[in-house]
Amino acid sequence: MAKATTIKEALAKWEERTGQKAGEAKEVKLYAQIPPIEKMDASLSTLVNCEKLSLSTNCIEKIANLNGLKFLRILSLGRNNIKNLNGLEAVGETLEELWISYNLIEKLKGIHVMKKLKVLYMSNNLVKDWAEFSKLGELPLLEDMVFVGNPLEERHTAEGNWLEEAVKRLPKLKKLDGNPVIKQEEEEGDES
């Protein structure tokens, strides 16, 4: 099997293809590398102006080396082999959107550091219980979330109470699984 692509190699290819310098770019796309990227290595720290970073569709197992990305607002890590959220604390003060669907995440430990997070796309992971889901309540600005395809969502959708139970735990949500959240109190208040 071919050796993995390093971040440094991927950045060199990206610079060649786009004619931009990685250290100056606001948006860097390193998705679907062939062979895939396996490690978020220290070369990421060169992306000092990056606001949107895409590393989706690779074989990354751990979130790491984000400390140099002081302006990162959107991080796309969908379709990797990520098992937990450790490593996000480095961008906890700036990250507004985390796209991390199609991974192997069971536990949401560490999510509480994401104080600016508004959008969380984490469909098709392995979250099974409400105790983990409830940790999302520690995100003060979270308003748009996709959680479809997690065992917890599948079980409660089958029982017919997913939306109600999820919104009860995350009352600030405006959108869940692509659908606007309509709150009962608001509806009743509108009629008076």
From Swiss-Prot:
GO terms for biological process: gastrulation with mouth forming second; swimming. Coiled coil: none annotated. The keyword Glycosyltransferase does not apply. Its main location: cytoplasm. It is found in: Cytoplasm, Cytoskeleton, Cilium axoneme. GO terms for cellular component: cell projection; cytoplasm; dynein complex; microtubule. Residues 150-192 form the LRRCT domain. SUPFAM superfamilies: L domain-like. Keywords: Cell projection, Cytoplasm, Cytoskeleton, Dynein, Leucine-rich repeat, Microtubule, Motor protein, Repeat. PANTHER family: DYNEIN AXONEMAL LIGHT CHAIN 1, NISCHARIN RELATED. Belongs to the dynein light chain LC1-type family. Part of the multisubunit axonemal ATPase complexes that generate the force for cilia motility and govern beat frequency. Component of the outer arm dynein (ODA). May be involved in a mechanosensory feedback mechanism controlling ODA activity based on external conformational cues by tethering the outer arm dynein heavy chain (DNAH5) to the microtubule within the axoneme. Interacts with DNAH5, a outer arm dynein heavy chain. Interacts with tubulin located within the A-tubule of the outer doublets in a ATP-independent manner. This is Dynein axonemal light chain 1. The gene is dnal1.
